[in-house]
Amino acid sequence: MSSTGENKNQIKIKFFTNEEDESLQVADTPLYVPVTLKRFGLSEVVNHLLGNFKGEDETKAPIPFDFLIDGVLLRTSIEDYLTKNGLSNEAFLTLEYTRAILPPSFLASFNNDDWISSIDSINPTTKIVMSSQLSISQPKILSGSYDGIVRTYNMSGKVEKQYVGHSAPVKAVKWISPTRIVSAGNDRQVRLWKTSYEEIIDEDEEEIEDGKTLALLEGHKAPVVDLAVDTQTNRILSAGYDQNIGFWSTNYKEMTSIQPLEYDSNVVSSSSKKRRKMAVQDATIRRRAPLSLLQGHSEPVEGVIFDAKDSTVGYSVSQDHTIKTWDLVTSRCVDTRTTGYSLLSVLQLPQVNLIASGSSARHINLHDPRVTTTSDQTISKLVGHTNFVVGLTASPHNQNMFASSSHDGTVKVWDVRAEKSLYTITRQDGSTNAKIFDVCWDDRIGIISGGEDKKLQINKGSDIAK
């Protein structure tokens, strides 16, 4: 006779998954579960249906799952979800389940000589490695620093190569191939670098190899703070505080040669021996002009990216509160979206058709670039950081996920299907005093972050985002 009372506390649901692994599929038969269940309880139900139990057989060990209702991650009990959405427990819910994102735990920390402004990485299966026809045996980390030096690290934390040439803080670094990189900095320079190809590094070799400057790419009249590389077209975008975007080739032979006209004025004014020495050294280096300069922003440009699906399209964000879409064939701006705050970083999530932009207002905007510009252009805002959001990086495993770095001293992991961040990463000692200037998510290495504490920190979850 108590079944009516029990039914009040239960709800009819059906499970489904888009996981490709057939062993994770359950029957779509409806069943009743308590409305008080949250993610953990629902995960137990699915594991029971899959026949997964704790025991000696690791192949049948329980798997942590996340759950979505109408494409939104469930972060409360079913009962709270019903209340929030004005539904009764007579509703019939369809729940999607997917492998859960496990917390990214601290893995390692590598020391650097100065603040770290920019990070990039490659591993044996990275797109730029596969397309270069050069193989590498181990992942590598690239860092740009406020001491003006670009460095590559191996996974033991050893600096393998360094690139000395910038006369002011380096603000952006990117891999072009295993033997080519590009960097940019406050000295207004974009530099193409070359290093010898060494598949096997001698771990006992104490001498750090110096990279060689292939060419100086000149055209900006103020600090250059961000770079994007498209390996399919061999093109580079640069974001300048002169309000311009540089469009370059990764091959210096494709750009017009220029003379070192008034070169001394192009070096940050200083009487330091280091900068005068650099200027003398650079006097013999080939210089190239940009293929074009994209003009349209009215304040410093903070971030640039290529469209992942169409290399002739680029996006930029600026302190002028706008995100612009560019036709790189004609060098024309084809779309401008205006916000109410300075935009400091930009990222594309191509599979879900979203552009994310980090702001000075501490939140992250998400918008669909395919949607015609309207007064309400933002699809959603992700709130959680307490200071500027200056770095964004996509998950290499999950099309809905990305990470952000902030001046609040943290890195946050996000899923666009959830209203709040999934996890917050602090420094190893738990502190949040030092600003985090950049973050890079590598599918082999993990989440790499760096900033004022002069450390490259690596965090990784065993099944994060898989």
Curated annotation (Swiss-Prot):
Residues 109-466 are annotated as: Sufficient for interaction with ERB1 and association with 66S pre-ribosomes. It holds the Pfam family NLE. GO terms for biological process: cellular response to starvation; chromosome organization; filamentous growth; filamentous growth of a population of unicellular organisms in response to biotic stimulus; filamentous growth of a population of unicellular organisms in response to starvation; maturation of 5.8S rRNA from tricistronic rRNA transcript (SSU-rRNA, 5.8S rRNA, LSU-rRNA); maturation of LSU-rRNA from tricistronic rRNA transcript (SSU-rRNA, 5.8S rRNA, LSU-rRNA); protein-RNA complex remodeling. Residues 11-99 are annotated as: Ubiquitin-like (UBL) domain. Keywords: Nucleus, Repeat, Ribosome biogenesis, rRNA processing, WD repeat. Gene3D superfamilies: YVTN repeat-like/Quinoprotein amine dehydrogenase. It is found in: Nucleus, Nucleolus; Nucleus, Nucleoplasm. InterPro entries: G-protein_beta_WD-40_rep, NLE, WD40/YVTN_repeat-like_dom_sf, WD40_repeat_dom_sf, WD40_rpt, WDR12/Ytm1. WD repeats lie at residues 124-163, 165-203, 219-258, 296-336, 338-377, 384-424, 431-466. It comes from the Eukaryota. The keyword rRNA processing applies. GO terms for molecular function: ribonucleoprotein complex binding. GO terms for cellular component: nucleoplasm; PeBoW complex; preribosome, large subunit precursor. PANTHER family: RIBOSOME BIOGENESIS PROTEIN WDR12 (PTHR19855:SF11), WD40 REPEAT PROTEIN 12, 37 (PTHR19855). Component of the NOP7 complex, which is required for maturation of the 25S and 5.8S ribosomal RNAs and formation of the 60S ribosome. Component of the NOP7 complex, composed of ERB1, NOP7 and YTM1. The complex is held together by ERB1, which interacts with NOP7 via its N-terminal domain and with YTM1 via a high-affinity interaction between the seven-bladed beta-propeller domains of the 2 proteins. The NOP7 complex associates with the 66S pre-ribosome. Interacts (via UBL domain) with MDN1 (via VWFA/MIDAS domain). Belongs to the WD repeat WDR12/YTM1 family. This is Ribosome biogenesis protein YTM1. The gene is YTM1.
